[in-house]
Amino acid sequence: MIRSYDPFSGEAPQATFNITFINDGGAECRFTPLFDLSQPPFGLSKGAGKAIGYQLVNLTDSQNVTPWAGRSLITPSTHQLVLAPNESKTLLYKLVANPAGVPEAGTFTQDVTIEAQGQGFTSFGGTRLVLGLEVLPSARIGLAGAYSMNKGQAVVDLGELRTGLVQTPLQLRVNSTGSYDLQVVSSNSGKLRLGSTDWTVPYTISIGGHAVNLSGAGLLAGPTGTGYRSDSAPLPIQFVIGDVSDRRAGTYSDVISISVTAR
């Protein structure tokens, strides 16, 4: 089982496992370890929906033993195991899932049988095991549009402050394995402040057309339902400036923190 996979980590979903073969008979035993699908079709799934492709590799003998057609393929280069009476040998296998095929969070599995097959398709025994991939609920956010970076922080220039909507093209991009929530926190509770003075200008913000409450921790619920969501439809971020009359000249600013939580 590949545990706790984060599809946005940039890492390949993979795990290794050992299988030990024991000859408890009184004669030498020659066989080829093969994987059979207990129930086609091929792929890790929840029982319905899109399946995730994978590969099985025998790392001990450097052989691909993936049961694409329902059973591991035997080729002229396939190694046989030869065990003397009461001898055992452990093989190391690696399961690698296709990260591009992950449709959503959840646990995706496939039941297989590992079989010791001798000549003439003779079976010396086998056992069932479950191949699986556990995909964690996960989400990532990023900005696009008119902003710059300064000491690791995104800086948005609102220009000369005027009451009303600021024409600044800015979008929030969200990648998620399903539903998500956004939290927005304003250091000045929805006010642009002149340095460390008490001079402030109120403002509001909306994300994706939804107003955010900046007086506390503003919460926004993302789309409901399951399934992988990409950033193909970025969420516009808009700023509306309040009353600027009778304010001292200078640079007014606030620090906004936006975080995302996958559900």
Spell out what each predicted region is:
Residues 1-46, 80-83, 87-199, 225-263:
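N-terminal small/polar-rich segments of proteins
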Residues 27-85, 192-217:
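Surface-exposed binding patches on compact interaction domains or structured appendages
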Residues 72-77, 132-133, 165-167, 216-221:
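Phosphate-binding glycine-rich loops and adjacent basic patches that engage nucleotide phosphates
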Residues 205, 220-222, 244:
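Surface-exposed helix/loop patches within compact recognition domains
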